[in-house]
Amino acid sequence: MPTINQLVRKPRQSKVVKSKSPALNVGYNSHKKVQTNVSSPQKRGVATRVGTMTPKKPNSALRKFARVRLSNLIEVTAYIPGIGHNLQEHSVVLIRGGRVKDLPGVRYHIVRGALDTAGVADRKQSRSKYGAKRPKG
């Protein structure tokens, strides 16, 4: 426990909280060609590469991902949720924060049913998370 005199000489330092999705905390001014510190809940981007990745040790699968160049010129890796997708190179996508625990370096999710990304077909439950329309009947 510090004495009052020690605290007067050197006050307590507050912990620096680091963002879990840093690319969403950067804006871009295209007129001045300079980055700004405007944060946003989602960002638009263009898929530069679409592929599959294998997860970390105890799991085994082929997880779908896309490398996305955002509107603030930062390039990130984003996960494509759901079964099947229509994304290819140059597709315009919307990304949100949210990591995938068993894929190292994947800190973002692509929003299904927004921009060029189609919703998951024949989805009955949790439809809003996958951009699926309400089934007829």
UniProtKB/Swiss-Prot annotation:
Record GO biological process: translation
Region (Disordered): 33-57
Domain of life the protein comes from: Bacteria
Entries under Pfam families matching the protein: Ribosom_S12_S23
PROSITE patterns reported for this sequence: RIBOSOMAL_S12
Oligomeric and partner information: Part of the 30S ribosomal subunit. Contacts proteins S8 and S17. May interact with IF1 in the 30S initiation complex.
HAMAP family xref list: Ribosomal_uS12_B
Name of protein: Small ribosomal subunit protein uS12
Gene: rpsL
